[in-house]
Amino acid sequence: MRGSEASGPGAIFGAPSTLTTSVIRNPTSFLSSSTPLPSTDADVIAQNVEHVLLSLTSHNDGGLVGVSGNSSGSTGKGILIGVLSAFGSATVAVLVLAIFFFFKYTRRGRIFLDRIGRPGEFDDEQAFAREEAEALEVMDDMARSEYMRAKSFVEANPPESMQTDISLSQFLAIQEKGVSAWEFQPELEIANCFVEGRTEIEFYDSECSVQTNLPVPKQNDVYYWEAKIYEKPESTLISIGMTTKPYPLFRLPGFHKTSVAYLSTGHRRYNQPFSASPYGPALAQGDVVGVGYRPRSGTIFFTRNGKKLEDVVHGAKTQNFFPTVGANGPCTVHVNFGQMGFVFIEANVKKWGLAPMTGSLAPPPPYGSEQGSILLESGRESAAQISQRVYQDARTSSTVRIPPSRSPGPVRSPTDISLAPLAHIPSHEDVGEGSSHANTIADEQTALLNPTDLDQVPPPEYSSPDGSRRGSDITGDLPNQSSPPIPSYDAAVGNQADNTLRPDGDH
């Protein structure tokens, strides 16, 4: 075979190869030998073959021949198919891992009605009864009795069985007082905690919870409140959260239906009396726990020292939740409903408190602001006049005059004779020389006093008239000790006889 007729790369740059020349010379033999053709016109087929061959060889100008084929297209398709298969495999692997982690970490709260052998495959009542039976086996007598007591209370008083919506009077109280309308009210029968200043709670040595008097409103998007742990021994368990009414207050919040709480151990409880789920860091003295509620979505979340934790409750839209704090030992917790700043900055900026700090009720008027009031002005003037008159009377007289009380009987004239005892009125005038002027002066200078005040008032000054023995000096009337003794009766009679005879002798 000649070089120019050899098949290979040289055939592309030179003359047509042997295969090409043979096809060109005898195209019909090539077609008949290769594949059987259907019964068609032979001339048309021959023309088509010649046209194809001419198109392949007409552009040979000494360079590379532009051969059109499907080699590049098939390579691109192969690469595309490989990439798509790789992405598909990765997607399937990601989906498998997502399903695995979903079933592993979110088993609580799911209800399966099929028989796949996982916990929670029954409905709520059956699952709760099974968990209750398992927990009662490991409880001690005290815990079992407390649980049965709480269970009896819940059965007799189902959650939300009482009217807890904010009434008109409560709404008006909130409008007047603001956030000060909320306060904790301990149960009198339990009496294991003491509330001071509406929001400062002190617990004692047994398990107890305390609720507020008003529920959390539902008008705004978010409501938020905080509780600060002031005193907490290590052995005390504190539970801070939300409950509905009625609730067994001898149990902690979160242990029974429609209640949720953040425990001081770092766990959370939501309608769960048997086991707690890990939630956040443990609480110590000085920590601040916040509770937030979104009424529109029914979501409840917690914060710790100003840092938001994950949501705990979803879909609780219809319940009326009450802020609740409980403990099983001595501790002190102070609650902030919005009367001061929050530790959680977002709640502080967006004003998520239960109500405004100040209500519409005006404070009492300050001292000295009665100048514009006629009633207060008249009362002030009358009081000033009375005090001035009393002061002047006290200065003009050494004693305060107390007028006698008026008799409830008919009014008597001054000339009527009364059988009532007359009060002794000392006089500065002579006895028997009475006059109206003297009586008037005596009345003006005399005070009618109560019997209890007679011992405290000194007697009035008194001087006897001239010539009266009552006014003479007592010491002058006393006999002189140095004078001779008093003569006897006989001597006195003899002296009297001598005195009677002496005038006769003179005559």
UniProtKB/Swiss-Prot annotation:
<feature type="glycosylation site" description="N-linked (GlcNAc...) asparagine">
    <location>
        <position position="480"/>
    </location>
</feature>
<dbReference type="InterPro" id="IPR001870">
    <property type="entry name" value="B30.2/SPRY"/>
</dbReference>
<dbReference type="InterPro" id="IPR013320">
    <property type="entry name" value="ConA-like_dom_sf"/>
</dbReference>
<feature type="region of interest" description="Disordered">
    <location>
        <begin position="385"/>
        <end position="417"/>
    </location>
</feature>
<dbReference type="InterPro" id="IPR035780">
    <property type="entry name" value="SPRY_Ssh4-like"/>
</dbReference>
<feature type="topological domain" description="Lumenal">
    <location>
        <begin position="104"/>
        <end position="507"/>
    </location>
</feature>
<keyword id="KW-0926">Vacuole</keyword>
<dbReference type="InterPro" id="IPR050618">
    <property type="entry name" value="Ubq-SigPath_Reg"/>
</dbReference>
<keyword id="KW-0735">Signal-anchor</keyword>
<comment type="function">
    <text>Components of the endosome-vacuole trafficking pathway that regulates nutrient transport. May be involved in processes which determine whether plasma membrane proteins are degraded or routed to the plasma membrane.</text>
</comment>
<keyword id="KW-1133">Transmembrane helix</keyword>
<feature type="topological domain" description="Cytoplasmic">
    <location>
        <begin position="1"/>
        <end position="82"/>
    </location>
</feature>
<protein>
    <recommendedName>
        <fullName>Protein ssh4</fullName>
    </recommendedName>
</protein>
<feature type="region of interest" description="Disordered">
    <location>
        <begin position="449"/>
        <end position="507"/>
    </location>
</feature>
<feature type="compositionally biased region" description="Polar residues">
    <location>
        <begin position="385"/>
        <end position="400"/>
    </location>
</feature>
<keyword id="KW-0325">Glycoprotein</keyword>
<feature type="compositionally biased region" description="Low complexity">
    <location>
        <begin position="401"/>
        <end position="414"/>
    </location>
</feature>
<comment type="similarity">
    <text>Belongs to the SSH4 family.</text>
</comment>
<dbReference type="InterPro" id="IPR043136">
    <property type="entry name" value="B30.2/SPRY_sf"/>
</dbReference>
<dbReference type="GO" id="GO:0010008">
    <property type="term" value="C:endosome membrane"/>
</dbReference>
<dbReference type="GO" id="GO:0043328">
    <property type="term" value="P:protein transport to vacuole involved in ubiquitin-dependent protein catabolic process via the multivesicular body sorting pathway"/>
</dbReference>
<keyword id="KW-0812">Transmembrane</keyword>
<dbReference type="GO" id="GO:0005774">
    <property type="term" value="C:vacuolar membrane"/>
</dbReference>
<keyword id="KW-0967">Endosome</keyword>
<feature type="domain" description="B30.2/SPRY">
    <location>
        <begin position="146"/>
        <end position="342"/>
    </location>
</feature>
<dbReference type="Pfam" id="PF00622">
    <property type="entry name" value="SPRY"/>
</dbReference>
<keyword id="KW-0472">Membrane</keyword>
<dbReference type="InterPro" id="IPR003877">
    <property type="entry name" value="SPRY_dom"/>
</dbReference>
<feature type="transmembrane region" description="Helical; Signal-anchor for type II membrane protein">
    <location>
        <begin position="83"/>
        <end position="103"/>
    </location>
</feature>
<keyword id="KW-0653">Protein transport</keyword>
<keyword id="KW-0813">Transport</keyword>
